[in-house]
Amino acid sequence: MSALKRFFVEQIGDTATLIGEEFEHAKNVLRLGVGDEVVLLDNSGKEYTCIVASVEKKSMLLNVLGVSEGDKEAETPVALAFGYLKNADKNEFIVQKAVELGVKEIIAFSSEYSSAFMNENKLDRLNKVSKESAKQCLRSFAPTVRYAKTLKDALELLQGYENKLFACEFALESQADVNTLYGSTAMVVGSEGGFSKAEESLANSLGFSSVTLGKRILRAETACVALTSIVMFSLGELGENSVKCRGQV
């Protein structure tokens, strides 16, 4: 039996209404109608099992049958800040994989060597990717992708995390042991041009530990997935063989 289709809505009470793109997808693509059951999500971590009560021209009314807590969220808060890339598909890939791996907070930023800049439409697109990825991997929470105009702004947004990792291609060795992490963790990965020495110094002054991902130079999107995977495994989020570590932000 396949899992029920999942949709994000703004508000849920005893009833809920699907509108906009979610409605169009439910009605015109999935051909859902009266009597069909779905799962609605309001980004609170809860999952609402609902039944379609009526379908109008531009909306779908659903009655709530039951509510439960989602069980796919990571126990340890993890954040990823990445340098915004020129290639839109690569930015979407980073967001998609971060969501699939369980990241709670995502920040795109511009830095000294960045050659691409964000606008409202691009940010909206990344948030749509976040929601679609959350639905695909059965998460009950879709991280809101935020944009920081400077690296410093991004670093300051991550000050509440217990572990702060700064992936740096010219770091000779890691200042933190990413294999034995405990508690909430923030990661920062640069854009195509990487970071300057001054940016590394800034990060270090704000409590970030420089880390290396090995002797080979990785593409930015590869570095994001690699570091996120390492961190999630270290925190016990990718298998029973690693130690579970909880943290708060």
Question: PLM features: what roles do these ranges have?
Answer:
Residues 1-70:
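N-terminal positively charged helical leader segments and presequences
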Residues 16-18, 75-79, 184-186, 205-213:
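Glycine/charged-rich beta-loop-alpha catalytic/anionic-binding loops adjacent to active sites
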Residues 62, 142-146, 210:
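Generic structural signal for residues in well-ordered beta-strands
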Residues 67, 111-114, 215-216:
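Short, ordered loop/turn segments at secondary-structure junctions
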Residues 71-165:
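RNA substrate-binding interface of SAM-dependent RNA methyltransferases
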Residues 161-201, 208-211:
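Active-site/ligand-binding-proximal alpha/beta "capping" segment
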Residues 197-249:
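Structured adenosyl-cofactor binding patch, chiefly the S-adenosyl-L-methionine
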